[in-house]
Every structure is written in C-alpha cells, then in structure tokens.
Amino acid sequence: MTTTDRAGLPEAGVAAVAAAPAPARRPRRELVAATVGSVVEAYDWTIYGILAPYFAEALFPGTSPTAKLIAAYLGFALGFLVRPLGSVLIGRLTDTRGRRYGLTLTVGLIAAGSLFLAVVPGYASIGLAAPLLVVGARLVQGLSVGAENPSVAAYVTETAPAGRRYFYSAVSYGGVVLGSALSFIVMNVLLGVFGESGVEDGAWRYGFVFGGLLGLTALWIRRGAAESAVFTAAAGKAAQGAALPAGAGAAEPEAAGPGGKAPEVKAPSPWPVLRAHLGRLAVVFAITSGATTAFYFVTVDFPSYAESAGAATKEETSAALLLGMVALLAAMLGGGKAADRLGALPVLRFGFAGLALGSVPLLLAMNAGRVPVAVVTVVLLFLLGLPLAVSNVFAGQLFPPAVRAVAVGLPTAAAISLFGGTFPMLAELLRSAGHNAWLPWWPALTAAVALAASWAVHEHPGHPGHPGHPGHPGREHPVSVTPHA
C-alpha cells in the first residue's frame, strides 16, 4: 500500500531508488564542493555586518555616524528581502541546467560582489552612486545566497553515499559555522595589523578582497566537481516524459564527471508541482523558521539580551559564544551520524523539543544567577545543532529532483527573511519598550511550531530506507508525507 501526502500524491518509487546500485564516484570531493560554498556564503554575510561600522563613513551619506551606519545596515536588510527571489530564479536554473551550474553561479556571484565592494569608490568621490552601488552589490549577493543553500541541499541529497547522507548534510552546513568564525578571525587580524583608525581609513577593503579570493577558490573547486547522478538521470527521463519521485537520492546512474557538461532538463513550469506539494512546503517553512529564529537569537542578539537582563556583559557573552560554536559544530556532526542510523526525524525532534521546552526555564535560571551564561549558550547551541544537521537533506528528500532546488529554496529563504532578518529589529523594539523578558518566548514558540510540523511527515517503516526494514541497503531514509488522523 502506498502512502500519500495531503494533496493525495503517491509516494512511489522510493524502494526502487533505495535499492539501486550506487554509482562509482568520489563523494568526498563532492562534499568539499558543497561545503566550501557554505563557508563563502557565511563569511560574506558576516564580514559585511562586522565591517559596516568601519566603511559606513566612507560609502554612505548622512548627517551623523549613526545615520550612515543605519544606511549601511539597510543594504544588509535588503539582501535578506531578495533571498526568496534568488531561490526561485537561480533555483530554477539549478533544477534545469544542473546542480553544478547552480553551485558555480551562486558562489561566482558572491565572489564578484565581494571584489566589487573591495574597489567601489567612496561617497566623497562619486556621491550617491557609491551607496547605490553598494546596495546593488548586496542585492546581487542576496539573490545568490537565496539559492546557495537549496542548491547545496539538492546536491548533497543526490550525491552523498548511502548511509552517510545526513552526516554529509551536517558537514556541508557546518561550513556556515566555519565561515562565520573565519570572518571574525579576519576582522581581528585587520584590527591587529592596522588598528581601528587604519581599518576605517580603508583597510576594511582587505576583508572583502579576502572574501572575493575565497569565493574564486570555491568557484574553482566547484567547477571541477561531478554533476549529480540523479540530475543526469532526471534529464534523460524528462526527455522520455518520465520523472523521478520525491525521495530519490544518491543511488542513480553514473554522474557526469568532473568538469563535464550536464544535460539540460527541458522541464515545464514548477508551479503546478509546487502547488501539489503545499503541505511539504509548509513543513520546510516551519522547520526553517524554528531553526533560524533560535540561531539569530543566540548568535546575534544574545549578548544584548544577557546584558539587558543583568546576567552578563556583552564581552562575557561573546566569549561564551566561542565555546557555544564548538558545541554547535559538535552537535551537527554527531547529529548527522545519529540520523544516518536512526533517521532524521528523531534527531530533529529532540533538538526542537529541547528548544521549545527548555529555552525559557534555562534563560530564567540564567537571569536569576543560577546558571552561568556559558552553560546556557552551550546547551542552546547544542540543541540547535541537531535540526541544523539534518534539515537540508531532510527537506531535499521531500521533493522530486525536477523542482528540488526551487522547492527547498522558496520556503527556506522566505522563513529566513521573515524570522531571521527581522529578529534583531524585533528584539530592539521589545527592549526599548521594556519587554526584554519576552524575548525567549519567541524562539521557544517557533521551535514548538517546527516540532509540531515535523509530525506531518515521517520516515515510513515500510520503505527499504528505514533502518528497521529487512531490505535496508545502507541506512537511507526516504521521507513520505502522510495524512495523520
């Protein structure tokens, strides 16, 4: 008996895909190609934010340093707003021209944007053209970042070896942690070499030069990676009027070799398929909302929250975040390994349940002086690392290859824009109104919604991908959506 999603779509073909022989490939090279782009994406996004106080004076107009800094952060916010558009435009190219095409395009545009910011003339030289060019570069980078994560999700879903798909997901997403850490390292080097005045006088440009060179390195690596075998198979099937089912992963015919050109899929509009998968899109949106709200609360707003609550200074909380990042990365790698044995949903649900039920009590205990800020930071980031470890590939398996990048990207980018991009503003509004104590309830609530949404899907024990099935070939976990009574 086949299962169906809420739109009544049959969950067919999963067993055949799971049981097919794996192709001879070099999955570690493909993993590096996926991960290096995540490093570039995170570095680019973080370095702009931490360098903004240093370049705002040179590039933006305003009657005061504060006004110039706000204008610089406006460019940051606009980049968030165009992410959903990028997930559709570039994601569509990823679904029709190949995963490698999308991966090289996104990282190439990010690199170009960084190099452009490194050389853009100042406001004193070209007037209003300077901030307009900066905002234009951020819009291009926002479009690229909107498609980067779903393109990686599609690529890892389809290229990771049997039994290691979620671990590969964790490693590739771990590039975000490494990229963020790298941006702070570069910032400290610039301050150590040039001092604050030197960075303000133009040394900030070296941060973008490094980002551009990092992006070009990632572009070179990705151009040499193999195309997804699933995409290659989908292109051939599309030419014959067939299609691969949702859940199709690594077990497909031989991929296009490194540097080889993938066949283009002459696919129809993705919108009819997406409309038929509205339930799955909602699940991805909810899961991403829960993860991104917690991420921005702990990694961006937490120092201000703890200081306002009288629990710790910003310096103490920032130091605790370094230890928390280690816990985050450890949880992601451990969670990925656990998901390959147990399935993604137990790992994802454990993390969200901990955030939903434990965030508020833990933070109240911290505010009362009963729990150190370092312990709270480590626990929250460890819990967050579990859903982050598996969410990319988990979402990728919900959709057929023909629309996978767009289907993952659209709800993901929308959730990040709505819940991540707005969280710092929401936090400041609540604090200014004297309601700092309300803040922990927001990530707890979104985590609870994500946990509830996860029960709309399950790893069906009747599929060979479930570890309890006697025909289980390598601990793969195809996902089906069922109408729970």
Question: Where do the model's predicted regions map?
Answer:
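A late C-terminal transmembrane helix in Major Facilitator Superfamily
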Residues: P401-A433
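C-terminal transmembrane helical hairpin of 12-TM major facilitator-type secondary transporters
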Residues: P346-V390
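Extracellular/periplasmic helix-loop-helix junction of adjacent transmembrane segments
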Residues: A52-L85
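Cytoplasmic membrane-interface "Motif A"-like loop-to-helix N-cap segments
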Residues: T96-V107, R341-F352
